Amino acid sequence: MPIVMDMNMLLMLSLAFTVMAPASASSSRFTQPPQSQAIVENDAADFSCEATGPSGDLHYEWLHNGQQIGYDSRVLQIGSNLRIESVQREDAGDYVCIAASAASGARQASPPAKLSVIFLDAVTVQLLGSNRNELLLKCHVEGASGDEPLQIEWYRDSAKLSSWQNVELQQHRLLVRQPSSADDGLYRCIASNAAARVMSKQGYVYEHLASVAPGSTKCLPKLKRNQKMPESWGKQVFLCRGKRGGSTGMDQSQSLPPSPEGLRIVQGPNDKLIIKEGEPTTLSCLYELPAELQNQRIQLRWRKDGKILRHVELGDAVVPGLALDHGKDALVREDGRLVLHKQNGTLSFNSIIASDAGQYMCQIQLEGHAPVNSAPGALEVIEQLKFMPQPTSKNLELGALGKLHCKAQGTPTPQVQWLRDAANGSLPEHVDDINGTLIFRNVSAEHRGNYTCVASNSQGQINATVAINVVVAPRFSVAPEGPIESSEQGVAVIHCQAIGDPKPTIQWDKDLKYLSENNTDRQRFSFLENGTLEIRNVQAEDEGKYGCTIGNSAGLKREEVRLLVRGNGDGFITEESAGDGFLVTRAVLITMTVALAYIVLVVGLMLWCRYRRQARKARLNELSIKEAGGDQAESGKNTEQEPCLSKQRNGHGKSRTAANGDAQKSDDTACSQQSKASKKSAHIYEQLALPRSGLSELIQIGRGEFGDVFVGKLKASLVAAASPSDKDADTEKQHSNSENGSGASGASGCGSGSTTLSTLNEKRRSKTSMDDIEEIKEEEQPQEQAQSESTADLLVMVKALNKVKDEQACQEFRRQLDLLRAISHKGVVRLFGLCREKDPHYMVLEYTDWGDLKQFLLATAGKVNTATATSSPPPLTTSQLLAVAYQIARGMDAIYRARFTHRDLATRNCVISSEFIVKVAYPALCKDKYSREYHKHRNTLLPVRWLAPECIQEDEYTTKSDIFAFAVVVWELFNQATKLPHEDLSNEQVVQRSLANTLEWSVAEGTPDGLKEILLSCWLTNPKERPSFSQLGAALSKAMQAAEK
């Protein structure tokens, strides 16, 4: 069912798309799209529409059910808004607002807004079932109420019913359980909505069988003239069958005594009254009521065509049960045009309509007596000449049969004729006018033009002109054919070409989701002018069902094709190989048999070898224990204390290996404790080794996720002693492993190897512009200065791994270590080394003299006390803030090019030096200093106010989620870090709105106009629609140049 609904919505939006040219990247956005609404018939409806764009550049159009609206005195376009003065039922449907740019020609369609018309015509009571156990009635309503439910009321005689005892109300139904004589009466229902309140035309009379006595209806055989009824007939029971539409009983009024002579009608309605439609009129009913009858129960009624239209009580008491007659209809309904005056019995009409025509009679009835009736009077209405409904323009398909209706009402009946707006006014060939219906036998191009419908009678003549447009339904000249197979990294071409008049537009979708230049990768997806879709560098996620929808004002057509992506080494069985099925099956069976025999042989050999190894290993272990003594226990203890990062073993371990070479070889064969990847990782960590004695003046600044964080000093000679050739060789090897499929995972499990791309190769491959060449030179210059100043101490940040047995903390420690080890960029802090002689392990990182960026911003904003100056430093200028953001973007772009993600980008995790150089760092002081900026979600501390929705929803971290966080960093910069993002919301509320994709972002005050659009795009829900760091760097560079002017 959801797929069907999505398909209907797809076709509806495609219909609106047929009138639009493809939208460019600069297309407008709707700030106030039209809203769906329900309107009472004949009331006014207003649709608002407003889009962003240069003033005077946009103009608006409206579509109704995919057709352009023809405006008249009732349907008006006021500016960009649409107003319908008197809503009719044919106005119901979907309305779409089109905003078109006069400069670029781009056209944008709003989401459809639905108009529902509320009306109420007639109500009837239907019998669904009647037996001794239950009576079931239904209130059938002809009308519509939009989204609001109809209000149904049930009455028995004049008493309103509710669910009580044996009576149960079920929406439109009335159920009476175990009916008895107490349930006898006339059942009616009243339906009401915003349009009207209408009572059922026909009620249902229920009479319990046990209460009907033989002969109670006085149903006797018809006697001939002068024939007397035998006395025996009065004691017999006769079967009565009334005529169709009649009654088996006698009229109650015939069995009642006549009214007193003083009660009479002096003057009734005129014999015949002719009134024009829309004019007022009055029907007279003058009566005399004696004084002695003032306290009696008397009712005055007006009947139309024998049915009660209005009634009023004349006496001082209310007459129950006199409002309606059993077995007859009632026309009593709320209508402000009719007024019954109690003083003189006059019935007034404020405005006559055509349905008021009929025979009227005035009636007075005293309780228990027969009614007094006036002479009937006829009311004739001269109906105004008008079209019903108004003819509208229409599109006819070339070569098909077309019809255009024109109906008119009036007194006398008008004559309807069609004319063509031409020199002679005659209709073209193969076009006939039959009783006001224009029939086109075979629609051709010459039938295009304006046609006028003329209706005339004795009142005069009216006309309506409509436009006939001849269109050609869209059809495929080249339809998509499939399935289409493509290999990964290959090129897939899906053809779709269409012809028609007007020229059809082509819209592609994948798995019922629209594809356009805005929501696809432009480097891989190309929408050619002829409609063909080309996909370059095919990925596995591109596999799916692709649909091509073509359409114009004549209709829509759609074809689907499936794209299958074949990975390396994968294959598909096609229909061409179906004939060779038997040969393939036989080959598979033979292969499986040989493989099974080989497996059995190998398993047998393995079991035999394993038995021998275990026996030999047991003997050698006994010898090892005797020779090594307690060394083995000490080694095992150290191994247990360091589950994440292994240390190099010295002394006894080496001598034992030399003495028991065969035993060691046997152990490695039996069960290896370290993979090749972990050995290589241990080799890398040995290259990063720093002596703990080289650190001095350690001062704790906070606590992170896996341990304490310090600031201290490191001897520069230890850093200068490291060989750069070793690091280059190591990074070259990492690049080789990455190319062979090892990947560059940003985080791995404890004890597993992790490899990244070489920073050197990234520079050679990605830095091609003059800007990047200068960056490489700037990075090399500090290295030369560091070698010349090897005697000075370096300011460092030290992160300790205290939770050595926490697998999650260990994994995060390794991820940050691999991230900072792989990056060599002036915008990212440098990893100096790793101290692993004893617990806890220390990660030694570069630090700056001015510390973290957030505290610097707070100091310049005057929010913290500075110890080095008597007054607060001045706030940063816009150019300086842009320079900070630009440096952070350059650093994050380097992380992206190394195929890593940061996951916690914020001003608190960046550092700034006195030379105004900003670097991306990773203090992550989530336990104390910045604990209020983290929230525990799914048993993990997360910076939820900086995270993209997919990180909270699916724990999915990508470069696009770092771009989301970068936009929040820019928001912090222009707020001087004095506010938290969404500080009016709690952390739980931020998480809930992120999960529901309802968290709204806006740029900070003071943000340059040139950055607002690209920063807002960083916060889009779809990660594919967010920009890249290179695009952000280019935008920031332009903004810096504009700010300096």
From Swiss-Prot:
Keywords: Cell adhesion, Cell membrane, Disulfide bond, Glycoprotein, Immunoglobulin domain, Membrane, Neurogenesis, Phosphoprotein, Receptor, Repeat, Signal, Transmembrane, Transmembrane helix. Residues 26-116, 115-200, 260-373, 376-469, 474-564 form the Ig-like C2-type domain. It is a single-pass type I membrane protein. Residues 628-676, 722-790 are annotated as: Disordered. Residues 725-736 have a biased composition (Basic and acidic residues). Residues 771-782 have a biased composition (Acidic residues). Disulfide bonds join 49-97, 139-189, 285-362, 406-453, 496-548. Acts as a calcium-dependent, homophilic cell adhesion molecule that regulates neural recognition during the development of the nervous system. Component of the repulsive Plexin signaling response to regulate motor axon guidance at the embryonic stage. Also component of a receptor complex that is required in the adult visual system to innervate the lamina layer; specific targeting of R1-R6 axons. Interacts with plexA; component of a receptor complex that mediates the repulsive signaling in response to Semaphorin ligands. This is Tyrosine-protein kinase-like otk. It comes from Drosophila mojavensis (Fruit fly).
